[in-house]
Amino acid sequence: MFAQILGETTCGIDGVQILVEVDVSNGLPSFDLVGLPAMAVRESKERVKAALRNSNYPFPMTRITVNLAPADLRKEGSGLDLPIAVGLMTCGRILEPEKLENKVFIGELSLDGRIRKVSGVLSMIMDAKKCGAQEVYIPQANAAEGKLIHGIDVYTVATLKELVEHLQGKNTLTPLPKENILQNNNKIYHVDFADVKGQLVARRALEIAAAGGHSILMVGSPGCGKTMLARRLVTILPPMTEAEALEVTKIYSIVGLLPQADSVMLERPFRSPHHSISGSALLGGGSTPRPGEVTLAHNGVLFLDELPEFERATLEMLRQPLEDGEVSISRVRAAMTFPSKFILCAAQNPCPCGFLGDSVHRCSCKQAEIDSYKRKISGPLMDRIDMQINLSRVEFSELKTKEKGESSAAIRERVVKARLLQQERLEALGMHCNAMGRSEVVKYCQLDAAAQNVMERYFNMLNLSARSHDRILKVARTIADLAGSENIEAVHLAEAIQLRTSVRP
């Protein structure tokens, strides 16, 4: 007997349809699994055998061969247990092949026949829909993800027996109701910019960063509020669109980080890895590449606190994602490209002791130590950070004032308006904020005569690079958008230059 069943696995952050071919023939009892299965897939033989027996279904004591096509793709995860079991029952005439057409089965089997949760179900359902499947059967624990994709019927099953009885017509299951992804997009944050005392320049810089998707470095002594400000950056970003929310949810589903209570990621990611992180954990890696922190921060914020404490080689890996908005990882088994459009927010002290330039504490570092500390961050990486600002100590009068600062909601309103202007301008290019390339800078960041004179004077005075020139123009374009100005004026350019050059080597 021969049967073909549709299943799904993941490759990178995308789903891939797998054709599970099951052949049961005469011969000595054996169970061969071919088609480049990973260890978790090879172990499915024992899980499937026990699940069938404990669900009171016969397991064929003959020669069994299971092929997972395409054979050149490595099959990861345990989600192929269910289609293998369905294929064996089809060969045993428990299920009719005609009733399995255009149906996809995803799930890990426990030894007692229950169907366990698997990672990456959202990507698999999206791929199943793209491949023309009409129905998908997933574990009950993955129901939240199954509600998100429209245009395909998604069923949840708790046990193997429940699935078989449904396919036999003895017990009818109903497909999951579809969920409007953005219906509950009213995120209440536990932190707010209103809590921040003083630091008006930093607040302004973070507003510009949020409006234009610009990277920012904050330099200041310990306790001046760098981390506090960075953690509030995500609260002033615009709400995610449906496409952005699905993309982020897909990434978090793949790596198994999707919150239990949430069906979809509506809050923009905020990732803050420790400075001891390895390059593979930051960018992604493994024998079969998996997403790293730069991808987990996609459409959100990547906060690197104590920037010079990171390994220099690790920081240098940020060059490609900062420039291209994606990261390419090549391994012997596979080459993957992951999305990584994030706002880099970095913070550091001005020197090893932290008090260089402080108005109260005296710096105890030698000049050689300060120079060595600054050299930990390379010039090419610094050149890719749009805004670099100094933070001063918060005065006692600012700290004790009863006046609350401007709230995150008020700042977010201005950010959203600026983003709408950028969306209208860049919609044809598939961009949604001012993270433009060279050709877009030339087209959309033109200067009048007065602004051109300001740019030329500071370009020569500060020995700026061509990249610095373009990044200043992009920040100036965002400042103009926040001001509701169609053109970049000299005042917008002057502010952009100040925010770019206040931290000098």
Residue ranges and their predicted role:
Residues F59-T62, K99-L100, K130-G132, H150, ...:
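Short loop/turn elements that form and flank the Walker-type P-loop nucleotide-binding site
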Residues M218-P259:
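Walker A/P-loop
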Residues A40-K45, P60, N67-G77, P289, ...:
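Basic, amphipathic alpha-helical bundle interface domains used for macromolecular binding and assembly
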